[in-house]
Design a protein with these regions (language model features):
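Active-site flanking residues adjacent to catalytic metal/cofactor-binding acidic residues
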Residues: 5, 38, 64, 91, ...
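Charged catalytic cores and adjacent phosphate/nucleic-acid-binding surfaces used
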Residues: 1-5, 9, 13, 19-26, ...
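Short helix-capping and hinge/turn segments at secondary-structure transitions, especially at repeat
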Residues: 86-87, 116
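Alpha-helix-loop-beta-strand connector modules within alpha/beta enzyme cores
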Residues: 53-61
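Acidic/Gly/His-enriched mid-domain segments of enzyme catalytic cores or analogous surface patches
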Residues: 87-97
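Divalent metal-dependent hydrolysis catalytic cores, especially in the metallo-beta-lactamase
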Residues: 4, 24-42, 87-89
Length: 194
């Protein structure tokens, strides 16, 4: 399963130029099996995205990107996080915009993964994220962080099984292997080094 785990839709992320239908169209064209909408500090799109997902038969998982005291974190199953069943990722931890956790990755407990490939982050900063991810034994995540059409699906996450519901997605993230993947122009390469 290939899923872009970090996308912004313009209704609740005002810095995005993407509408939900456009995101889904591009994702399908690139062969993605699902997408995640992770708007800034909002899950307001959830009901609309769930209804659209049912209507078109395509998984759309709504999470949230929130700014913590030390940096941005994305989360899915946020209502499950309180029960310790949600999934939390440090997104773009070494991006030079002061919104990443940076070395605080070591201090934040209960993180499940690290965005080791973020489409809006320079490669060297992504490599630093990969080193920390491995040091901490967390899940490696790839995500576009798209705000514009050409970024959708640039980097994604590979899972060995396909899931279609948010609870199953969260369970899969916890229990299955994850690997980042890179769009090549005609398909995806699942990578361990970059």
């Amino acid at each position: 399963m290939l899923v872009d785990m970090h996308l912004h839709e313009c209704t609740y992320s005002t810095d995005s130029f993407l509408h939900l239908e456009e995101i889904v169209s591009i994702a399908r064209q690139k062969g993605l099996d699902a997408i995640c909408i992770t708007d800034h500090d909002s899950m307001g799109l959830r009901e609309r995205a769930e209804a659209y997902s049912r209507e078109i038969g395509y998984p759309i998982f709504v999470g949230v990107e929130f700014f913590s005291l030390w940096g941005d974190i994305t989360a899915w199953g946020i209502d499950l996080v309180r029960e310790k069943d949600g999934f939390c990722v440090s997104c773009h931890p070494f991006r030079s915009n002061n919104r990443g956790l940076r070395e605080h990755l070591r201090d934040v407990h209960d993180l499940d993964g690290v965005e080791v490939l973020n489409g809006s982050t320079p490669l060297e900063e992504n490599r630093t994220a990969l080193r920390f991810c491995r040091e901490l034994g967390l899940k490696a995540i790839g995500a576009s962080d798209a705000h514009v059409p050409e970024q959708v699906g640039k980097y994604v996450t590979w899972l060995p099984e396909t899931v279609t519901t948010l609870p199953d997605f969260v369970t899969a993230l916890h229990t299955l292997e994850t690997r980042p993947a890179i769009w090549t122009g005609s398909g995806y390469d699942v990578v361990t080094e970059f």
